[in-house]
Regions:
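Structured C-terminal helix/loop/strand segments within mature extracytoplasmic catalytic/sensor domains
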Residues: 3-22, 37-45, 152-153, 157, ...
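Beta-lactamase-like hydrolase cores
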Residues: 31-72
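Sec/Tat-exported extracytoplasmic proteins
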Residues: 46-49, 86-96, 107-109, 139-142, ...
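Extracytoplasmic
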Residues: 50-52, 69-71, 79, 98-100, ...
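Mid-domain, small-residue-enriched loop/turn segments at the edges of structured enzyme/sensor domains
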Residues: 52, 127, 148-207
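Soluble periplasmic/extracytoplasmic beta-strand elements of cell-envelope proteins
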Residues: 54-58, 67, 83, 104, ...
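Active-site SXXK
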Residues: 63, 75-108, 138, 271
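Conserved catalytic neighborhood of penicillin-recognizing serine enzymes
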Residues: 110-148, 157
Length: 301
């Protein structure tokens, strides 16, 4: 073999490998920051509670991501209500409904004194609320009565599942109304999503073209006005960020917070986090969501 050719071969091989690595660099940079081992705060939650936490977060401008159990199923609890409002708004966009139309409301829609329906309870004497008012109550206040009445209006849990399928989510499913949708038996796929799938829904509904600009503005406004998120992601996200979120919890072992947040105008970050299982206390759940918020602020801002 010619010595000159022998010397060239390794150099050419190096050049090819270098070009391949450079070409792959954007994809490598977009991989989750902790795909195999969770950060200490998440590991501690799973160890101390016996439950699990799932996270998917992505800066849509830089492509940077954080993920842990991002493709595992978690019970949604009330976080489904943001998608429910999106379905209502899609129907409005198609002329099938109107935000000003009234939905009847009566004492029979509040089954017990401890039933969580703050807006419905305040308005029982009126006998009705508008579609827009019920959407705002369901998303901003997590009102269960308003959510159930809206579900009935759009065709029930199966209709919401069909909406997810039609708009690109092949994972998320709703099988029950409130309060049955909050059950969390291990391994049961009913009423569940994954952090990654729900982040995709937020991207399509809040930032994408599934809804008209005015409908996106309505949905974002209701999420910006979230009244139930102080002890969730908002507990750790930078206070200067714009935060639009929807929470959920079953009062036992499951909770979630899904959000679109903006560190700066025009720089959206998706954050979807869920916990389920084990025996967590309220303080442990609040603490780990705050930890996730801080992590997102430090790594994806």
């Amino acid at each position: 073999m010619n010595d000159r050719h022998a010397r060239r071969a390794p150099l050419e091989g190096f050049a090819l490998r270098r070009r391949a690595l450079l070409a792959a660099a954007p994809a490598l940079a977009a991989w989750p920051a902790f795909a195999q081992t969770p950060p200490p705060a998440l590991a501690a939650y799973e160890r101390d509670t016996g439950g699990k936490i799932g996270l998917y977060a992505e800066n849509l401008t830089t492509g940077a991501k954080l993920a842990w159990r991002a493709d595992e199923r978690f019970v949604m609890c009330s976080s489904f209500k943001a998608s429910l409002a999106a379905l209502v708004l899609a129907r409005v966009d198609r002329g099938q409904d109107g935000l000003e139309r009234l939905i009847a409301l009566g004492p029979w829609d509040v089954p017990s004194d401890d039933w969580y329906a703050p807006i419905a309870k305040q308005n029982l004497a009126k006998g009705a609320l508008s579609v827009a008012e019920m959407c705002g109550a369901a998303v901003s206040y997590s009102d269960n009565t308003c959510a159930n009445l809206l579900l009935a209006r759009v065709g029930g849990p199966a209709a919401l599942t069909a909406f997810w399928r039609a708009t690109g989510d092949g994972v998320t499913r709703l099988d029950h109304n409130e309060p049955m949708l909050n059950r969390s038996p291990p391994g049961d796929p009913q009423d569940t999503t994954t952090p990654r799938a729900m982040a995709g829904n937020l991207r399509r509904f809040v930032l994408g073209k599934v809804l008209s600009p005015s409908s996106r503005e309505h949905l974002t406004g209701w999420m910006l006005n979230c009244q139930t998120g102080a002890n969730r992601l908002r507990g750790g996200l930078p206070t200067t960020w714009r935060i639009a979120d929807k929470t959920g919890n079953n009062g036992k072992d499951a909770a979630g917070d899904i959000a679109v947040v903006w560190p700066r105008p025009g720089v959206p970050v998706l954050v979807c986090a869920y916990v389920q299982g084990g025996s967590p206390g309220d303080a442990q759940i609040a603490s780990v969501f705050a930890d996730v918020g801080r992590m997102v602020g430090q790594r994806l801002g």
